[in-house]
Amino acid sequence: MNQAPVRVTVTGAAGRVAYALLFRIASGDMLGADQPVQLVLFDLPHAMKAMQGVVMELEDCAFPLLTEIIATDDPVLAFSDTQIALLVSARPRAVGAERLEVLADNAKIFAAQGAVIGRHANPDCKVLVVGNPCNTNACVAMKAAQKFSRIPARNFAALLRLDHNRALAQLALKTGRPVGGVKRLAVWGNHSPTVYADDRFTTIDGDSVPAIIDNIAWHHDTLVRTVDKRGEAILAARGLYAEASAASAAIDQMRDWWLGTRGEWTTMGVVSDGAYGVPAGLVFGFPVITDCRDYRIVPGLAVDAFARGMIDVNVRELTAELEIVKPLLPELFG
């Protein structure tokens, strides 16, 4: 274990999702069993006492890969020279609040964090936005960072892996086969109830999923609706939002981004280059293949009428979200 430690910053570090995330990062689940890490925990001043408790627990685990823990409420210290930033914290949705209200509340938070990242982070920093609404939050952070012309737009991503994992699980449950055999799944769009789980190209143990599940209504209705509504179902069942599964998905997405997928498909929310008719500049869920800490959108997939409609619904929703945000941040979108 002679590698230099990777500096990883986690925001909202005193929160519940971060609590499910930090110990797995420190144990090597995200970057590998031979990669040391330096953890930087960032949260607001009122959370510092709770964050110190998290620090003590991390220390008490005696993780061999964890070389240093820094806990701070100073964003410049938190993001200086960081190589990976996991933006977990976001202003939660109040009871009865609409999604668009949450957008407005979070726009300035992610603009501020993006600006600090753009000025102070490692130029090769990979930024994964976990806090919802993550697509538009990622777009805002990306635009703020671009003002400093140091970190490429493609280094910002939104957490679409949770939707991907949910769809993988449903396909495994439906077919009675191990989830590890599910390949070539595509998930498109926004991390919201419009997200589109697309199994037209998917295989399980090499067998075509559309051939195994010969029921178009299941693909177009049951699978899509189950993935779309999964967060609501978890909230109704446990009285809390999905936390452990969100943290696990963040681990999965960053691990694949950092270490590569060896030719396999996964899903990331990335800035569109115009592929599949998605307007350039939107942060949108696409099927991707990752390698060498970079990604490419899977090219040349057929888009039938149903898929076109589902992709377009997501384009409209994300465009509408940005229209809410733009007047609040004219310095970024003017």
Swiss-Prot record:
The active site is at H191 (proton acceptor). It comes from the Bacteria. Signal peptide: none annotated. It catalyses: (S)-malate + NAD(+) = oxaloacetate + NADH + H(+). Its EC number is 1.1.1.37. The keyword Nucleus does not apply. The keyword Repressor does not apply. NAD(+) binds at G12, A13, A14, G15, R16, V17, A18, N106, Q113, V130, G131, N132. It holds the Pfam family Ldh_1_N. One of its GO terms (molecular function) is L-malate dehydrogenase (NAD+) activity. Substrate binds at R93, R99, N132, R166. One of its GO terms (biological process) is tricarboxylic acid cycle. It is an enzyme of class 1 (oxidoreductase). CDD domains: MDH_chloroplast-like. Keywords: NAD, Oxidoreductase, Tricarboxylic acid cycle. HAMAP family: Malate_dehydrog_2. Belongs to the LDH/MDH superfamily. MDH type 2 family. Catalyzes the reversible oxidation of malate to oxaloacetate. PANTHER family: MALATE DEHYDROGENASE (PTHR23382). This is Malate dehydrogenase 2. It comes from Albidiferax ferrireducens (strain ATCC BAA-621 / DSM 15236 / T118). The lineage of its organism: Bacteria, Pseudomonadati, Pseudomonadota, Betaproteobacteria, Burkholderiales.
